Amino acid sequence: LRSVGPAIDVYKMIASLKPSNTNYAGTVQAAYSAYNMLSSTEKQYVTNFATLQEAKNNADSVQTVISKIAGISPTSRNYAKQVEEALAMYNSLPSAVRKLVTNYDALKSSQKEADTVDKVRQLISEINPNASNFESKLKSARSAYDKLSTQQKRLVSNYFLLEDYEAQLNNSSFFF
C-alpha cells in the first residue's frame, strides 16, 4: 500500500488541474514532473494520465500561441498573414484554455489594424478606370488611405495602383 501513495498523490494532482487556475501551466508541469518520478509500477495506478497529457498539450499550445502573438511585427510585409496565423492558432485552442493566452488583447488590436489595412487594399483593388464610378471610387480609396497611420500605410501593398489611377485621372482631365 505504501508504494501506491505517491501514485495517489499524482492522481489527485492531475484531477485538480483546472484551466481557470492562474498558474495552470506550472501546475501541469509539477504534475508531469511528479508522474515522471514514479516507478513504472506506480505509474500503472495513475489512471488519469491521459488527462495530464491533454493538459500538457494544451499548456504547450497556449505557450506557442503566446509566442506567435508576441512575434507579430507591425513592420513586416507579412503582418496580415502573421495576424491571421496567430488568430487561427488561438481559435484552434480548446475554449477552456483560451483565457490563458495572456496577450490576446494584442492579437485583437493587431487584427483590427490588419482588417483596416485590408479594407483599404480592397477599396483600391475595386477601382476600375473604365467604370462610370471611377472618380468616386478613387476618392473613397484615397480618403480611406489618408486616414491610415504611417505604419498602416506601409502595409498597403497595392498603393502604387492608387497613385497610377490618380495620375490617369489627372492626365485625362487635361483633355476635357
Model-based region annotation:
Residues 1-176:
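Beta-rich interaction/scaffold domains
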